[in-house]
Amino acid sequence: MFKKYFCFSFLIFSASLLITWSAIGQSKMLSKGDAAPVFSAQASLAGSAFDFSLRTALAKGPVVIYFYPSAYTGGCDLEAHTFAELKDKFTAAGATIIGVSADDIQRLNSFSSDPNYCAGKFPVASDPEGKIATTYGLTFTPPKIGIKDVRGQEVTHGFIPRTTFVIDKKGEIVAVFSSEADHISPAEHVEKALAIVKAL
């Protein structure tokens, strides 16, 4: 009798876990008007690792958080390069830029200092398990075998969809756009974000 009860209870528990996990995986992407989840993460600026705090950044002004799939891949390289080119204009608007991907900090140390990409102009943060992305309602895709970056190196981390959140200094999301939903290019992410922070 006890054995049957135990097995039945275990099945119910397992089913509840599956339901909970499914709900987490299908969480809705945050939108305009939502409070931006604060986070801290290991990040890199100009090849040097440091601890980035969204709370600290917001104390200085608006923040542009741009999630991207991977360093050293076509669209992400273009996006980083465009942010670097327009960094002074974001600074003039009082805004902080932070990129977030699942790349490990070693890759980001290289990417953040590469003159062709981030060029030491703004930091990029590591979210290796997609925990930050998940709090923003983004889907974290597990690693895929056989994918290589523009340098020919295998990409072993998971992926976060290209999505940009513009957050005002009160911590409220004032704009969000994604390549998947809005069908915009990596460069357009940057241009739209700049136009919004200028208007704040």
What are these regions (language model features)?
Residues 2, 21-24:
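General N-terminal leader/first-domain-start detector
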Residues 9-20:
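Bacterial N-terminal signal peptides
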Residues 1-11:
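Bacterial N-terminal signal peptides that target proteins for export
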